[in-house]
Amino acid sequence: MTTPIIETGTPTDEELMAALQGGQDAALAPLIERWELGVKAFLLSLGVPSADVEDIAQEAFVRLYEKRASYRVGAAFKPWLLTLAGNLGRNRLRWRFRRREDSIQAMDASQPGGFHYADPLAQPASTLAEKANLAQSVRSAVEALPANLREAVVCVELEELSYNEAAQIMGCTAKAVETRLYRARQLLRTTCQKLFAKE
């Protein structure tokens, strides 16, 4: 006999995974609903072209279902899911690179499938426009980082994961995450100093 998914209140991700492991396939739907946007945002922040994000996110949830038995009940769910999604995203990026399909145009906001940010000219006040320009500059600086450094910034600074959780996702040690984050911050500091010196 299986236990019901929802006993009282809203089940945690970990409880839903335990239910999914116990044969309750209905536990997958709330996980997808909760995490679909977060997975897509994570993939975009890793540099996956927006044209590929939907497919990879769907594949991540298919893998979640297929690999549900490998999830250790009681372990943090977020790093486990982002590891699945990140691996799929990195595989797609490697595939694109090998096929020479990845180009500067994919990063160009004027091209379909590129990154799209808020138009700073659409802001009503000059201070909002300045903030939008600053945010765009920082975003561009982060995107210009080497992939392993950018991934450390995304995991620790944007996703607010611990070094250990980030290490699990990135497939390295917590010390390596710390080192990559240090190097990324150094590069970002230099880039931002150059930006502000121009103004």
Predicted features, each with a name:
Residues 3-4, 21-30, 40-59, 174, ...:
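Short, charged helix-capping/linker segments at alpha-helix termini
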Residues 32-50, 67, 142, 187, ...:
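Amphipathic, Lys/Arg- and hydrophobic-enriched alpha-helical face
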Residues 52, 176, 183, 187:
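Residues in the helix-turn-helix
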Residues 2-5, 9-10, 99-131, 162:
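Internal acidic/polar
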Residues 94-97, 150, 185-199:
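Short, Lys/Arg-enriched C-terminal cap helix and immediately downstream tail that follows
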Residues 66-73, 83-104, 131:
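Arg/Lys-rich amphipathic alpha helix in sigma70-family domain 2
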Residues 139-176:
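Helix-turn-helix DNA-binding module
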Residues 21-22, 48-49, 61-76, 95-97:
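Sigma70-family region 2
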